[in-house]
Amino acid sequence: MAALLPELINGYSVKAFNMNSPLVQALLRGNTLTDHVLVIVQLSGGNDGLNMVIPVADYSKYYNARTNIAIPENAVLPIAGVTGTGLHPAMTGLQSLFSEGKANVVQAVGYPQPNFSHFRATDIWMSASNSRQEVFSGWAGRYLDYEYPNYPVGYPNSDMPDPLAIQIGGLTSLTLQGPTRNMGMSITNPTSFYNLISGTNDYAPNTRAGKELTYVRNINKQTQGYATVIRAAANAVTVQSPYPTGNSLADQLKIVARLIKGGLKTRVYMVSFGGFDTHSMQVNTDKVTGSHATLLGRVSAAIKAFQDDIKFLGVEDRVLGMTFSEFGRRVKSNSSTGTDHGAAAPLFLFGKYVEAGMLGVNPTIPANALVNDNVPMQYDFRSIYATILEKWFCLDKSVVQSLFPPDINTQLQVLPLLKPGACNGVTPPPPPVTNTDLLVTNFPNPFTSRTTVQFTTAGGHTLLQIFDTLGRLITVLTNQEYTAGTYRIDFDSEGLPAGLYYARFQNGITQQVRAMMKVR
């Protein structure tokens, strides 16, 4: 854990990180010629994706699984260009962004062997590790370390006078942790930040707090340079478009927009918004309002205001945003009008260069959902990161792969999330897969002990995995290069309990999930 200096310096809290901590240290580094910015919005607590992005085409199954919290079908907001799927009625702001061609929802994002602990699952998402691997650096931190390999020596400088990453409020997270040092700084109010690092010349006692104070002083000269440019950037912007009041996420995003317009070259901004651990009282009696509706409404309004503001400020060409939460919720609601920790869930991308619409299909919902049923993964979250690194930050594919653990990088997809022009060579969207385009099937289905899984590949790297309803990876049937064609592989379920299983097929930028039922 990052160690904080508990005292206040001249009345201001200064956050310094113990240099021996696995989460520690200071700022960032530049190579690739791009002025692009990524804004990461963390939804803390585990957001209920099924009540945020609602599978209207499978409404009867959705309703049967969630009778006490299901959003009324006639209240679901349609999404421009998408059929059979809608948004929670509180998300009118995001609905407008879809209509403007500036929002995308990626369905069922997750990873094999999901972890249901808030802390561990958050670490997995921030580090891009696998479920059973501890990685003490963040995916964005490793990217920044690649771009600025000599930091902190010689920074700030004329080429990069600004912080490489900024987190608004709280601690700098694992996301921004580089291999040896933290690549981000945390600020609360940019107009007063200059004051936060001044007046630190009192005697430092020989205590843990005193050592932290000495560390603050050691980085003071460097931080002083960043404080100056942050203050100048904030003061350079005097007019912004309106933001909702009483909305802490909107307050954070307003600062981000101000700093971007003010001229900072900062590559990554991170903001957070909590309260999504909705085990109980998620909805009111009308199902449309309640604690979850309030959260989603604030997220939607904040992102819409931010997007309007960066357009007003003339910087929207440079900015891409994404949301994430450490996990989704179970398919079936609980008896407390809430939902319990689950696996895969949708996430949003927003910005002028987003390929608007929906990537993926509605999640598979069992006709008679059980308490342990989870949304099966369609997209690995690390493929979202890889796409951003290659198609937004313009990195070579080999560099992107080097930023992920070796057992993951060969399975990364570059997804059709961004419009051509963000970087050269953006992958065009694949042709839509209809219900009749079954790329993966199995027979017999239901089956007792063995079933044959048939898949049709367009050629190239092909992955076929089997998951259970908890999202655990049971086996990998194949993970290799193929020539185009149709192939069959037997799946032997000997020793596995009866129940629902999912075959996940991945080929290039295409994937499908097939539900398979084992009976006694």
Kindly give the residue locations of the regions a language model identified.
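Feature for exported/extracytoplasmic and membrane-associated proteins, marking the mature portion
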Residues: 1-301, 305-313, 332, 346-423
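Short, glycine/acidic-enriched loop or turn micro-motifs at the edges of active sites
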Residues: 45, 280, 329, 448, ...
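Active-site lining segments that contact anionic ligands and/or coordinate catalytic metals
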Residues: 266-268, 316, 324, 342-345, ...
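Hydrophobic alpha-helical bundle architecture
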Residues: 309-317, 321-340, 348
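C-terminal outer-membrane/trafficking sorting elements
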Residues: 432-443, 447-520
